[in-house]
Design a protein with these regions (language model features):
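HotDog/MaoC-like acyl-thioester-processing domains
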Residues: 1-4, 87-89, 100-161
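A conserved, well-ordered hydrophobic junction motif at loop->secondary-structure transitions
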Residues: 33, 38-57
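Non-catalytic linker/capping segments at the edges of enzyme domains
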Residues: 1-40, 140-161
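Hydrophobic residues in beta-strands and at strand termini
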Residues: 36-38, 83, 130
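Hydrophobic beta-strand-centered segment that forms part of the acyl-chain substrate-binding groove
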Residues: 60-94, 99-100, 125
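Short coil/loop residues immediately preceding or within conserved phosphate-binding loops
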Residues: 20, 76-78, 108
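Short beta-strand micro-motifs enriched in acidic
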Residues: 26-28, 98-102
Length: 161
């Protein structure tokens, strides 16, 4: 299990933010994932989790899926998302993401949220593009590596060379 480093200020990932989700992203070779169970503080008027929170989780995972496969810092350009079933509070789910394909300019990726039985509750496909003027070292220098392995730290240090 390879826990990925997190951006220290991330609402979704930081383990230090009291108001955040404190997700841990795991690198599994051909995909990334996170297990989560979110409480009522993010419950909508329909007694399910806000779709914006769900998209945010999938967007973060897509960013990591791209980073791990291409070593590129990318930004979301276009999304196609489906919310198939409501996601309940205080129930365990797993969100996954994997790279579909990448060429010189366009990077296509997908993510989805499923329950313990593999039923998919929401899914997204997206087009990402490499961020212009973005410096990988500026981002990576703001990562928290406290839960990563030395090998994962070494992988991310290779971005700085």
């Amino acid at each position: 299990m390879n826990i990925l480093p997190v951006y220290k200020a991330s609402f979704f990932l930081s383990q230090q933010r009291e108001d955040g989700l404190k997700l841990r992203v795991i690198y599994a070779g051909d995909h990334v994932y996170t297990d989560f169970q979110i409480g009522e503080q993010f419950q909508s008027e329909t007694d399910s989790l806000y779709n914006g929170i769900l998209f945010g989780i999938m967007d973060v995972l897509m960013w990591y899926a791209i980073l791990m496969q291409t070593k590129k810092i990318c930004m979301t350009k276009k999304i196609d998302i489906e919310f198939l079933e409501p996601i309940s509070c205080n129930v365990p789910y797993r969100a996954k993401s994997k790279l579909l394909n990448a060429d010189e300019k366009d990077i296509h990726v997908t993510a989805w949220i499923e329950d313990n039985n593999g039923q998919v509750y929401s899914k997204v496909t997206a087009l990402f593009r490499e961020g212009r003027g973005m410096n990988a070292s500026d981002i990576i220098n703001n990562f928290d590596f406290s839960e990563t392995t030395p090998e994962m730290k070494e992988f991310f240090d290779s971005f700085l060379e």
